[in-house]
Amino acid sequence: LHYQEVKWRKLGSYEHRLHLKPGRLAKHELEVFNGYFVHFPAPENMIPIG
């Protein structure tokens, strides 16, 4: 699963959107800010969605 995550503030509240691309493999890392990455392991009990 490959995804993009967008969060922005509008009129005092935050909106959060995920753009998903099923079928694409993604590395176990997430770019947080200005090239900094957070690494995370995939859960072993993860079940694919239909």
From Swiss-Prot:
Location(s), subcellular: Secreted
Keywords carried by this UniProt record: Protease inhibitor, Secreted, Serine protease inhibitor
Post-translational modification: Phosphorylated by FAM20C in the extracellular medium.
Disulfide-bonded cysteines: none
Main location: secreted
One MF term in the entry's GO annotations: serine-type endopeptidase inhibitor activity
Any one annotated GO CC term: extracellular region
Family: Belongs to the ITIH family.
Known partners and oligomeric status: I-alpha-I plasma protease inhibitors are assembled from one or two heavy chains (HC) and one light chain, bikunin. Inter-alpha-inhibitor (I-alpha-I) is composed of ITIH1/HC1, ITIH2/HC2 and bikunin.
Function as written in the Swiss-Prot or TrEMBL entry: May act as a carrier of hyaluronan in serum or as a binding protein between hyaluronan and other matrix protein, including those on cell surfaces in tissues to regulate the localization, synthesis and degradation of hyaluronan which are essential to cells undergoing biological processes.
Listed name of the protein: Inter-alpha-trypsin inhibitor heavy chain H2
Species the sequence originates in: Bos taurus (Bovine)
